[in-house]
Swiss-Prot record:
The gene is proS. One of its GO terms (biological process) is prolyl-tRNA aminoacylation. It is found in: Cytoplasm. Homodimer. This is Proline--tRNA ligase.
Length: 479
């Protein structure tokens, strides 16, 4: 039995050290490994398969709203990056530069894209001439480079995978509608696919994207009580259009500037899944995103007929549309159970000679470890139902955790005490002054996460300065 436990013994307890627990899970579940390039990581098959499932489902949802995929170069000339001053100032500290082409110095250095607003603007300048060319609703799946000082697998790395949508519209109203539409798409995706509840809201001016008129965000609460920004949608107004000269002729033959949006999510969604649902045995994956949904584990598989029945069950489950693995390795059952739990496979099916003789199998849920004995003939019908239940239960548990770790502060002493002694979101009123936002961060390390669309009037005054309040804000320590 000691050998069976090696997989889980290697994981640090969440309560002992959450950061180390997270790293242990990433490595032991074989999601990633570290690269020889500092600050970069290697996606192993198990980790990349999760990203593929995220990408495929999100891309399907994008296309239902009229999004088309494109791909633009990864290099941006310095002169192009500097066209929009607020934008370049926001990214300058993180930019990686290419100064040589082979052995020859470049006449103009190129940055490796930290984001692609400037490239899309340069592209749209030539693509858009008339109102008939609008709207443009493009997205690209790619990697970007930001020279981060502190990195952590999936959450923050110097190169990461993401999608970035860039759109151009004839009117401000159309741009705002698209901005909100994509934020809602992200929120629905997180809740329906990743089983992660999110708060939708608007960023403060201090926290909004460089060059945007407004930034909207979805904020999730991790198991350790820290917030994770899980997707953003930006309304650029006509600021970038004026900087780059993106104009169109309207129906009255008048020249007008387009209105633009940008929206994106990244592989930090994988980190969000790990930190929302995982436990001390490893990953707990929502069925809709799990690369393998069912692990069929034959017990005493060398006995006549056991392995054949396991293969037969595996084929029946695949025919029912499930992602299935039959673990026919020569490891003992205890080791296989530990590995299945470590990898977060939502359901395992245990079957040995006595089970087969009785025409039954045991289904074990990864999230609750509940055991359900089912007729082998009913597995293909029952398991999809159980997976649906797991998906719903995981969302409800995550929502209950968030509600239990969301606090209200009506004065500054209460705010500071909550920030010092409790982990989670703090709801508090704010006057709209950046000085108060800065003071709260300096005193408590809490940042404004968002001004939620669902506003509550907790009091009439700012929690920090006592002046009249303008909005209720979610505050928290964040990744």
């Amino acid at each position: 039995m000691a050998e069976d436990k090696k997989l889980v013994e290697a994981i640090t307890s969440m309560k002992e050290d959450f950061a180390q627990w997270y790293t242990d899970v990433c490595k032991k579940a074989e999601l990633m490994s570290y690269s020889s390039v500092k600050g970069c990581m290697i996606f192993k098959p198990a980790g990349y398969a999760i990203w593929e499932n995220i990408k495929n489902e999100m891309d399907r949802r994008f296309k239902e709203t009229g999004v088309e995929n494109v791909y633009l170069p990864m290099f941006i000339p310095e002169s192009l990056l500097e066209v929009e001053k607020d934008h370049v100032e926001g990214f300058a500290p993180e930019v990686a530069w290419v100064t040589y082409g082979g052995l020859n110095p470049l006449q103009e250095r190129m940055c490796v894209r930290p984001t692609s607003e400037t490239l899309f603007c340069d592209f749209y300048k030539d693509e858009i001439q008339s109102y008939r060319d609008l709207p443009k609703v493009y997205n690209q799946w790619c990697s970007v480079v930001r020279w981060e000082k502190e990195t952590r697998p999936f959450l923050r790395s110097r190169e990461f995978l993401w999608q970035e949508g860039h759109t151009a519209h004839a009117t401000a109203e159309e741009a705002e509608a698209r901005t909100q539409q994509m934020l809602n798409l992200y929120a629905d995706f997180c809740e329906e696919v990743l089983a992660i509840p999110v708060i939708k809201g608007r960023k403060t001016d201090k926290e909004k994207f460089a060059g945007a008129e407004a930034t909207y965000t979805i904020e999730a609460l991790m198991h350790d009580g820290k917030a994770l920004q899980s997707g953003t949608s930006h309304n650029f107004g006509d600021g970038f259009a004026k900087a780059f000269g993106i104009q169109y002729t309207d129906k009255d033959n008048k020249l007008k500037y387009v209105h633009q949006t940008s929206w994106g999510t990244t592989t930090r969604l994988i980190g969000a899944v790990i930190m929302t649902h995982g436990d001390d045995s490893g990953l707990v994956l929502p069925p809709k995103v799990a690369p393998v949904q069912v692990d069929v584990i034959p017990i005493m598989q060398k006995k006549a007929g056991v392995l054949d029945k396991a293969y037969e069950v595996g084929q029946a489950l695949k025919a029912a549309g499930l992602r299935v693995k039959v673990d026919d390795s020569d490891k003992n059952p205890g080791w296989k159970f530990s590995e299945q739990e470590m990898r977060g496979i939502p359901v395992r099916v245990e079957m040995g000679p006595r089970d087969i003789e009785a025409n039954q199998a045991v289904i074990v849920r990864r999230d609750t470890r509940e055991k359900i004995t089912v007729s082998i003939d009913e597995l293909a019908d029952r398991i999809p139902e159980i997976l649906d239940t797991i998906q719903k239960d995981m969302l409800e548990r995550a929502r209950a955790h968030r509600e239990a770790h969301t606090y209200t502060a009506l004065n500054y002493d209460e705010f500071k005490d909550t920030a010092a002694n409790k982990a989670g979101f703090i709801k508090a009123m704010w006057c709209g002054d950046q000085a108060c936002e800065d003071k709260i961060k300096e005193d408590t390390t809490c940042t404004s996460r968002c001004m939620p669309f669902a506003q509550e009037k907790l009091s009439d005054v700012c929690v920090c300065c006592g002046k009249p309040a303008k909005a209720m804000v979610y505050w928290g320590k964040a990744y």
